[in-house]
Amino acid sequence: MRKDHRPYFVKHLYHRMTVAYVNHFIRPQLDSLGWGFTFMKPWYVKIFGAPIRIGRFATLVAASDRRIRLCVWPDQPGRGAIVIGDYCMLCPGVRIGAAQAVVLKDNCMLAGNVYVTDSDWHGIYNRISVGKTAAVTINSNVWIGDSAIVCKGVTIGENTIIGAGAVVVDDIPANCIAAGNPAKVTRRLDPARRMVTRAQFFADPVTLFAGFDAFDRRWLAQNTFRHWVRHLLFPSRSD
């Protein structure tokens, strides 16, 4: 697709449909879901187990070939939880599995195919039990790169970046960049530099969302329903 051919009213209707889908099908599966959420293709977000909590202004982007999966499978009665803070973003293919607890604090971003788990899910010698478990804590404003894996018992400090494909098996301190298998610190961030987070992006949500709507109205103003249907059935290079 070279551009969005939908007329404004179709895109607006689609957005309302996704919000309704989240409220009808996904919200009841969660212990809490904050307001201001954005779910892209929410029918590809799969939830299993409880408790799972998601904070305000969450952004979840799923796809047919890369579903987001949040799974709580307790190793003992009364344990197991996934807690996702405010302003967090999960990209296509993200998987989070919790036998004890996985906590993402505010402003965290997980790129495509990231896997976070607090368990081995099988023992080395006992392949029946869940195996060793240890809670995972990802502190505020952490950015985890594409296809990285965060293993049991890990704590990642605030503002830290985890490189693409990294395998994190030990704690990573705050304000650094870590990469590799196993992940090691490769660079320290300058603590004197001002850090801009997703919280600032959503600081004035009414104005922000009104701006998005105004942009769509302008950008899609020339699109007609007839042209959109023709594009779907008979696409051409001129589209």
Model-derived regions, located:
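Domain-scale signature associated with acetyltransferase and cell-envelope carbohydrate enzymes
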Residues: M1-T117, N139-S140, A174, A183, ...
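Glycine-rich NAD(P)-binding loop of Rossmann-like domains
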Residues: P77, I128-I138
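Beta-rich strand-turn-strand
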Residues: R95-A99, S147-I161, A166-V169
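Conserved catalytic-core motifs of eukaryotic protein kinase domains, centered on the activation segment
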Residues: D120-W121, N126-I128, R188-L189
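A short, glycine- and basic residue-enriched loop/turn
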Residues: A135-V136, G153-V154, N175
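Short helix N-cap motif at coil->helix boundaries in the Bergerat
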Residues: D170, R187
